[in-house]
Amino acid sequence: MIRTEEMLLNVGPQHPSTHGVFRLVIKIDGEIIKEATPVIGYLHRGTEKIAESLQYTQIIPYTDRMDYLSAMTNNYVLCHAVETMMDLEIPERAEYLRVLAMELGRVASHLVWWGTNLLDIGAVSPFLYAFREREMIINLLSELCGARLTFNYMRVGGVKWDAPDGWIEKVKEFVPYMREQLEGYHDLVSGNEIFLNRVKGVGVYSAEEAISYSLSGANLRCTGVHWDLRKDEPYSIYDRFDFDVPVGSTGDAWDRYVCRMKEIEESLKIIEQAVEQFPKDGAVLAKVPKIIKAPKGEAFVRIESPRGEIGCYIASDGKKEPYRLKFRRPSFYNLQILPKLLKGENIANLITILGGVDIVLGEVDG
């Protein structure tokens, strides 16, 4: 008689494929995962509570450290919430700089995902190529704001600095270069039989399940749901750009891959149009007081980050600090479906599924 024995196995919190301090406790029977329990909180810093004792401008650097792979979108959602409460009109040049910064950040974020996800399942070369192109974007953003990762660039009313001389031309030159590299990425990976066997039909869920788990971003669109806040609830100046929203059909790891790769192409379209439409002159910061006091009341805004729908709720009592600040962090919500996806799966597919969800632990823990 064959007897099997279940075993508990810890993945993390210091495992290279969790990309941060994330612990996953799995119960396995042979090669099959019977149960998976995420353990989070190792990177919790109490950002929302700290914000209650900070001025609005002082909170911006804290947002950089949530989704540190896409800090510009975090900067923006906070500023956008305060601007909504103050009914501020943002200078046009500042809006274009914001869009350029956010879309460059989106491309850089997806490049990190592409390279590390493939490295985790055994492909080393794509990781090197992805970081080569990401370094070019980081250099562009560094020229713009002086930082490489935690940018602290946006302000309530606009941005801190104007683009330096020649910066727009460099961004313009980057777009065709990146498109050419994308073709190489697809030649290298997207048709590779070994890769396709690792991702097709793995980690499948339906549109109904995605919605019930509050998934967003590529994790939602891979099921065929056409939902992108840049298109469906345009903010900033996104209604001025012509771009598509990539969607999948089967909701597996392959569709999530395709959605993110196509999103890079769409971001390049937006960058190209923003460069062409970029105002020749103008202010980059609205006339706002040095110490900002949002009027009494509350506001909630949401935007599309590389990981999905990030929201910011502010309750103000008219002081220079928020009475209450709350972020809707997409990585936290996207993580919730992981136990369901892993149950009954072969342990060899664990890293493929985890990588496909694309979480950032600073955003999960807040």
Swiss-Prot record:
It is found in: Cell membrane. One of its GO terms (molecular function) is NAD binding. The keyword Transport applies. Its EC number is 7.1.1.-. Pfam families: Complex1_49kDa (PF00346). It is an enzyme of class 7 (translocase). GO terms for cellular component: plasma membrane. It is a peripheral membrane protein. Keywords: Cell membrane, Membrane, NAD, Quinone, Translocase, Transport. InterPro entries: NADH_Q_OxRdtase_suD, NDH1_su_D/H, NiFe-Hase_large. NDH-1 shuttles electrons from NADH, via FMN and iron-sulfur (Fe-S) centers, to quinones in the respiratory chain. The immediate electron acceptor for the enzyme in this species is believed to be a menaquinone. Couples the redox reaction to proton translocation (for every two electrons transferred, four hydrogen ions are translocated across the cytoplasmic membrane), and thus conserves the redox energy in a proton gradient. NCBIfam families: PRK06075.1, PRK12322.1. This is NADH-quinone oxidoreductase subunit D. The gene is nuoD.
